[in-house]
Amino acid sequence: MKMSILFLFALIASLACLQLTFAAPAASPFANPGASPEAAPLADPLADPFMPISGMLMSGMLGKK
């Protein structure tokens, strides 16, 4: 049980690091600490390559023909 919790924590931490690695500089608060929160919606929509896929997953369109 303890190992599965540690594995889950390591998986989440590695995914967070990957997100910070591939995020656009305009959308990352670490890359641009002076950026205002209002500037986030104006960021490049192509900055997150997984956004269209997650949108399709949430709407249930992925996998339908």
UniProtKB/Swiss-Prot annotation:
Which UniProt keyword terms apply here? Amidation, Antibiotic, Antimicrobial, Fungicide, G-protein coupled receptor impairing toxin, Immunity, Innate immunity, Mast cell degranulation, Repeat, Secreted, Signal, Toxin
Q: Does the keyword Metal-binding apply?
A: no
User: May I have one GO cellular component term?
Assistant: extracellular region
Which residues are modified to Leucine amide? Answer: 62
Signal peptide range in chain numbering = 1-23
In which tissues has expression of this protein been reported?
Expressed by the venom gland.
The GO biological-process annotations, alphabetized, read as: defense response to bacterium; defense response to fungus; innate immune response; killing of cells of another organism
Propeptide intervals in chain numbering: 24-49
Keyword Ubl conjugation in record? no
GO molecular function term, any single one: toxin activity
Q: Where in the cell is it found?
A: Secreted
Q: Where are the AXPX repeats?
A: 23-26, 27-30, 31-34, 35-38, 39-42, 43-46, 47-50
What protein family is recorded? Belongs to the MCD family. Mastoparan subfamily.
Q: Tell me the function of this protein.
A: Antimicrobial peptide. Shows activity against both Gram-positive and -negative bacteria, as well against fungi. Also promotes important mast cell degranulation. Shows little hemolytic activity on rabbit and human erythrocytes. Its mast cell degranulation activity may be related to the activation of G-protein coupled receptors in mast cells as well as interaction with other proteins located in cell endosomal membranes in the mast cells.
Specify the protein name. Answer: VESP-VB2
Provide the species name.
Vespa bicolor (Black shield wasp)
